[in-house]
């Protein structure tokens, strides 16, 4: 199990976020043996969380690295802290528009992780699930990317926010269950 900790909405002031992430990481480690994923849009906040993490209990995880400006520094940070590393398919120009961009962006992320010798079993790839209510093709973009990534990188973990697929639609539970099943089969 992995528990995600994010404090980005707690404060607009970096110093306050650093204190909040330290507190939330330390508190989570007091009440669970689960891996703590340190999640922020700010690399310095992630670093503060990694510094507060007690590595004698378990390893931390970083959520998440992508091709957006400033996120690449998380790769050597993961190596330095022996952290699991989550990568998502967001590109330097923004969100991926199709399956091919998802695969291309995550392949580039994989190459960057290779440079820092991040072990394959420590890599988690998120092709990004978008709501099909906003675009019916979004479901297939994700599923096609999952299939290609599974073939290309069979030893890495694939994951995603599967419940995003049904956002704004009725029968969400049924749709989510079907989408998870399709993702497993992809």
Task: Indicate residue ranges for each PLM-predicted region.
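Gly-rich Lys/Arg/Thr-decorated short loops/hinges at beta-loop-alpha junctions or inter-strand turns
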Residues: 1-9, 28-30, 55-58, 86-97
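Glycine-rich, proline-tolerant flexible connector loops at the mouths of alpha/beta enzymes
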Residues: 1-34, 46, 129-139
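Catalytic beta/alpha-barrel core
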Residues: 2-11, 34-42, 59-69
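Short beta-strand/loop segments at the ligand-binding rim of alpha/beta enzyme cores
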Residues: 31-37, 56-62, 153-167
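Short glycine/serine/threonine-rich phosphate/pyrophosphate-binding segments
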Residues: 45-47, 176
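Active-site-proximal beta-alpha core segment in soluble small-molecule metabolic enzymes
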Residues: 56-79, 83-87
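Catalytic alpha/beta core domains of metabolic enzymes, predominantly
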Residues: 73, 80-186
């Amino acid at each position: 199990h992995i528990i995600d900790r994010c404090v980005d909405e707690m404060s607009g002031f970096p110093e306050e976020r650093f204190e909040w992430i330290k507190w939330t990481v330390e508190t989570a480690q007091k009440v669970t043996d689960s891996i703590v994923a340190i999640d922020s849009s700010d690399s310095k906040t992630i670093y503060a969380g990694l510094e507060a993490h007690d590595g004698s209990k378990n390893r931390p995880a970083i959520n998440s690295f992508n091709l957006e400006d400033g996120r690449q520094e998380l790769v050597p940070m993961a190596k330095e802290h022996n952290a699991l590393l989550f990568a998502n398919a967001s590109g330097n120009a923004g969100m991926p528009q199709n399956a091919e961009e998802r695969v291309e962006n995550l392949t580039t992320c994989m190459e960057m992780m290779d440079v820092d010798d991040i072990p394959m079993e420590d890599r988690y790839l998120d092709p990004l699930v978008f709501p099909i209510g906003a675009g019916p093709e979004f479901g297939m973009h994700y599923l096609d990317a999952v299939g290609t990534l599974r073939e290309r990188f069979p030893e890495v973990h694939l994951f995603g926010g599967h419940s995003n697929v049904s956002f704004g639609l009725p029968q969400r539970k049924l749709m989510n269950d079907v989408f998870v099943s399709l993702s497993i089969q992809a």
